[in-house]
Amino acid sequence: PHRSGTNAHLDAVHFRGLGFENTPTWLLNTMGKSGLFEDYRLKKAQVITWWYLGEHGTFTYWPDGPDGPPQVLGHPMWNRGVVVENERMFHRGDPVGRPDERDVPGLAHRSLLAYDASTDTWRITTDGAVIRTYRPEEMRLLVHWSAEVYTDLDEVKKVADHTDDLTLEMAIDRLLADMRARGTRVGEPSDPLHDTEFIRAAIATYTVAPTTDWLDEASG
């Protein structure tokens, strides 16, 4: 059992030449939401599978876009999965377990999780002290597999050989031009990756997300 943020989100998009290794997540997400870089976007697919017998822990997603109605992959959540492109579809992992069990006092980065065969329970320990135990049916296993998808061999070579990569300078210039065309007043950032005025303006210009005020306490 654990809490989960109520907000739906998109996973960070990768582009030819720009990814986690050289570009901050806020910029990748902004570029993805802007729709200005589809010619550079790396297409991906994910398979997510759950093995869980406890309460809540469902998966909410917006297959018709952020303005469309959400759908919920509900129970039974045992050996059940989805094939998705989570860089393009808003989604959220719903909180797991009963609300009164989601906080774990004493949990730390050094805490350990182990199975105790003598009691048929899973135990969380911190510095050797047991702070929480779970029955097997309360445990949830989630497997998330991701792959890049290519139309043909020419597209594979374009990515592998870096013959048509996007650069940070190209990305910033394209964003600035579009923001100004939309009427957004923004100055020329001297350091766009750290210029808070530019960052706020870019995020505000391209922010889009579903509403989640319909979530109740148990599910959210």
What are these regions (language model features)?
Residues 56-204, 208-217:
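Catalytic core of Fe(II)/2-oxoglutarate
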